[in-house]
Amino acid sequence: MARFNRKVMPHWRSGFEEEVAAFLKIHQNKVRYEKLKIEWIDLAYRKYTPDFLLDNGIIIETKGRFVASDRRKHLEIKRQHPELDIRFVFTNSNAKLYKGSKSNYEQWCNKHNFKSAHRVIPMEWLKERGKPIKDKIVYVKKRVKV
């Protein structure tokens, strides 16, 4: 019986993540997909896995829908890990936060000091100087009993 040796490609959670990965494959040394875990505290210790990690240490989160629970989670992570540079790439940055909302995803990001982009990672983000993240897990600095 013949065996086939083929490279196993990562399993993308969406077509949009696959598009971003293809873009990064061209413009980065290595595509780091879900390679980092960030510990954060809610009512318990939780771990968040961002989508992509750039060579310069910038964390990219790709989003189709940006629901209230994700927004709250990212505000908490930013509060607990101010040293991390988390940025969003939306399929539609002009989408409203919820039905009837006056603000959209991009406005929410601006209000809360997150950088965001529409569909494509800007080349400026790839060229920015930064500090690469070498750890696989970023822990909360001060652990408390929950």
What does each model-identified segment do?
Residues 1-146:
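Nucleic-acid endo/exonuclease domains
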